[in-house]
């Protein structure tokens, strides 16, 4: 509401031309507001088109696990997701995922957006931040990197392999930033979102409205079952960058092929 000290101007006589102008201005603002809302609400198709080929299904085989996910071979653990990642290349064989997806794996298979399958191996792991880097001969387009310093309420989408059904997209907003001490990992810096995230989505991409990576899907808050409650977390791009920098400094990661 405008300051009340100026409200007296509202009672002044209004000539007809000004009244007509005011009416048209009101209509114009309403129309542009609707278009703006539609633009923000309908970013999902463009976000998907810009990024989905950079997101893969990750099928880890865990010892002694007898409940495979949808379409997975016997002995396969609940599926996860991964993201083709590189600093300076358009095409890469490096895949980011959540460490808890692959930590126990005796074998890892990835499936790209075209349905091609290949073996991947663990290249480096940061258990404290729950980040792992896989390497595979099945290269793919490195996802474009965004900025995780998004205003609260910004539109974002999550792409991942929910319930092992294959990659899908869900959209929502940034609910909070810099969430820490949640209890998932030793070192945390999460983006909280209400975009639907379910088991199998871990390691998938949280993307902005332009389809650029802003976080790596990591966990959900739920009480009684693995059901999305709208309180979901992605590792921030800043924390991912810190993790990869430490991996490089320690010599475990990763020389990109020129």
Q: Model-derived features: where do they sit?
A:
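Flexible, gly/ser-rich surface segments that form the specificity/activation loops bordering the active-site cleft
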Residues: 143-148, 152-188, 198, 220-228, ...
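Gly/Ser-enriched beta-turn/beta-hairpin loop segments
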Residues: 67-76, 123-130, 177-191, 223-227, ...
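A short, Trp-centered hydrophobic/proline-enriched beta-strand micro-motif
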Residues: 50-71
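Conserved active-site neighborhood of the chymotrypsin/trypsin-like protease fold
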Residues: 63-64, 79, 86-167, 241, ...
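Catalytic nucleophile loop of clan PA
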Residues: 83, 197-217
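Bacterial N-terminal signal peptides
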Residues: 22-33
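C-terminal cap/linker of serine protease catalytic domains
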Residues: 42-50, 209, 213-258
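Short beta->alpha transition motifs characteristic of CBS
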Residues: 97-103, 175-176, 199, 215-222, ...
């Amino acid at each position: 509401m405008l300051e009340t000290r100026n409200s007296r101007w509202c009672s002044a006589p209004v000539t007809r031309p000004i009244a007509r102008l005011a009416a048209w201005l009101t209509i114009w603002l309403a129309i542009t507001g609707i278009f703006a809302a539609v633009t923000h609400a309908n970013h999902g198709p463009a976000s998907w088109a810009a990024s989905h080929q950079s997101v893969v299904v990750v099928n880890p085989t865990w010892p002694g696990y007898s409940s495979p996910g949808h379409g997975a071979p016997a002995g396969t653990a609940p599926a996860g997701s991964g993201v083709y990642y590189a600093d300076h290349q358009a095409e890469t064989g490096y895949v980011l995922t959540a460490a808890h997806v692959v930590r126990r794996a005796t074998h890892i298979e990835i499936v790209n957006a075209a349905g091609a399958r290949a073996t991947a191996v663990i290249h480096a792991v940061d258990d404290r931040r729950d980040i792992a880097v896989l390497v595979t001969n099945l290269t793919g387009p490195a996802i474009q990197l965004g900025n995780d310093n998004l205003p609260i309420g910004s539109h974002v989408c999550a792409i991942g392999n929910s319930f092992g059904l294959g990659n899908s997209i869900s959209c929502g907003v940034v609910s909070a930033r810099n969430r820490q001490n949640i209890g998932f990992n030793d070192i945390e810096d999460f983006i909280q979102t209400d975009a639907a995230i379910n088991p199998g989505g871990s390691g998938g991409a949280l993307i902005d409205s332009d389809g650029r990576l802003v976080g790596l899907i990591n966990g959900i808050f739920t009480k009684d079952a693995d059901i999305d409650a709208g309180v979901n977390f992605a590792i921030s791009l800043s924390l991912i960058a810190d993790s990869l920098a430490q991996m490089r400094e320690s010599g475990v990661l990763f020389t990109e092929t020129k």
